[in-house]
Amino acid sequence: MENGAVYSPTTEEDPGPARGPRSGLAAYFFMGRLPLLRRVLKGLQLLLSLLAFICEEVVSQCTLCGGLYFFEFVSCSAFLLSLLILIVYCTPFYERVDTTKVKSSDFYITLGTGCVFLLASIIFVSTHDRTSAEIAAIVFGFIASFMFLLDFITMLYEKRQESQLRKPENTTRAEALTEPLNA
């Protein structure tokens, strides 16, 4: 009994941290809350806005710099906002906040970002110096803005589908509504 033989049949070793495919940081990251199309669109928004920002940062000189600076601000903001929304959707933070508010915020942020990014790309087209970095930034900017607007249209379509499912069918007869009450 001095060697602890009494406790050996019932004592189990501590298994330690979980090992497997969903351990560590991957356990907190879940992409399944978004449908496949929306996941692809969010990823493209993130990538294209980052590429537009990087290409714009490569520009070393400009003649009319207002369009360049506005495009820089918008492309960086679009990247950060799309990253923020993606983090909210893919982490446990999504369950801690009201999901309708997350979806509503995503809806309006995506619309606003798409419109402002399109405007910034149009302004940058009219003020650029025709260097290859500027042209690449403009192309990525236009494609990114279209991805934001396509994501907005997808969300709008999903909202309409949800409202159609929630709307009860009108089962009352039209002729019953026109009959007099005292007849």
Swiss-Prot record:
Modified residues (Phosphothreonine): 171
Modified residues (Phosphoserine): 8
Modified residues (N-acetylmethionine): 1
Subcellular location: Cell membrane; Early endosome membrane; Recycling endosome membrane
Key words of the record: Acetylation, Cell membrane, Endosome, Membrane, Phosphoprotein, Transmembrane, Transmembrane helix, Transport
Ranges where the MARVEL domain occurs: 33-160
Main localization category: membrane
Tissues of expression: Expressed in the leukocytes, placenta and testis.
The keyword Transmembrane is assigned to this record: yes
InterPro entries listed in its UniProt record: Marvel (IPR008253), MARVEL-CKLF_proteins (IPR050578)
GO cellular component, as recorded: azurophil granule membrane; early endosome membrane; membrane; plasma membrane; recycling endosome membrane; specific granule membrane
PROSITE patterns linked to this entry: MARVEL (PS51225)
Cytoplasmic side: 1-39, 89-106, 156-183
Transmembrane among keywords: yes
Membrane topology of the entry: Multi-pass membrane protein
Extracellular side: 61-67, 128-134
Membrane-spanning residues: 40-60, 68-88, 107-127, 135-155
GO biological process: endocytic recycling; protein transport; regulation of protein stability
Family: Belongs to the chemokine-like factor family.
Its biological purpose: Master regulator of recycling and plasma membrane expression of PD-L1/CD274, an immune inhibitory ligand critical for immune tolerance to self and antitumor immunity. Associates with both constitutive and IFNG-induced PD-L1/CD274 at recycling endosomes, where it protects PD-L1/CD274 from being targeted for lysosomal degradation, likely by preventing its STUB1-mediated ubiquitination. May stabilize PD-L1/CD274 expression on antigen presenting cells and potentiates inhibitory signaling by PDCD1/CD279, its receptor on T-cells, ultimately triggering T-cell anergy.
Quaternary structure (record): Interacts with PD-L1/CD274 (via transmembrane domain); the interaction is direct. Interacts with CMTM4. Interacts with CD58, ARG1, ENO1 and TMPO.
Protein name listed in UniProt: CKLF-like MARVEL transmembrane domain-containing protein 6
Species whose genome carries this gene: Homo sapiens (Human)
